[in-house]
Amino acid sequence: PDISGRCAIFHVHLKPLKLASDVNTDLLAEKLSTLTPGFSGADLANVCNEAALIAARLEAPAIDESHFELAIERVIAGLERKSRVLSPEEKTTVAYHEAGHAVCGWFLEYADPLLKVSIIPRGVGALGYAQYLPKERYLFSTEQLHDRMCMTLGGRVSEELFFGRITTGAQDDLSKITRLAFEICASYGMNDKLGPVSYRTEQESMHKPYSERTGELLDEQVRALVMEVHARTTKLLTGHKADVEKVAKLLLEREVITREDMTNLLGKRPFKQADEADEYLDKKGRLARKGESSAPPPPQDELQQDPHLASSQSEIPPP
């Protein structure tokens, strides 16, 4: 469903829940629909169920917005695995890896807006996690796809720059960009040497709709595109090496950082048009200011600890 469809679905699932007295159902449904692009109807129902379970585990008298935010994280990325203890060296590597993704996304115009970064292990294999707020697009330009590839490669390039070595943590990233590079060259007609052709096929299929010679050219162009994006990502992060270090150090200190933390460290994203995350956070700030007269803000230390309060956060395969 689109954003209006998600909002309507949330209205249905919010009705039977015991919400905190200061929660406006209409505003909450609007906010949750903004935070859940790409979610199915079943996913939206799971968010509401998880929010109720989280509130029960925390022995909260009612469900508030923070419980829904934690529920979205859990649906996206799975359970926190604090029992999975990383060595100091591994934790540092994960922090710089995630910082590389975050800084890349911050300085690429078409990258998905960042909401939160975590180095708390989650789910089955994820050692780090980033939550983004992608725009609901139906068409993608070459520039948008290339920026997405650069952000995905940011973790591996950060490891190369800071440690002079690479780890297996980037395997999922490499799989994603290789598949995207293949689609750009073989399906979207965005490669000059192959021309405006589209070979819609599964990479694993035994029968290819092109000749062996074209297959060799396709392999060559996919590799060339990945290397071009790698060089661009290296140039970007080399110019922002100090920023990567700032973000990584804060991650090691707090384990979870938000978009507000990124703004404090790096300044606002250097692009004229506000993205969805900016608009969402501006709206969130206005709502918070409206409620200040009726309820005092939580203590600062509580704000910093909030991402760790529940045993339910979200997880995405390490970018």
Predicted regions and their residues:
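Conserved C-terminal "switch" segment of AAA+ ATPases
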Residues: 1-69, 74, 78-79, 152-160, ...
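A short alpha-helix capping/helix-coil boundary motif
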Residues: 11, 81, 225-228
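Short, flexible loop/turn segments with low-complexity composition
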Residues: 24-25, 65, 88, 275-283
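Short hydrophobic/aromatic residue motifs in ordered secondary structure
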Residues: 43, 100-101
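Short pre-active-site segment immediately N-terminal to the catalytic Zn-binding motif
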Residues: 83-93
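Soluble catalytic regions of large protease machineries
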Residues: 92-96, 102-319
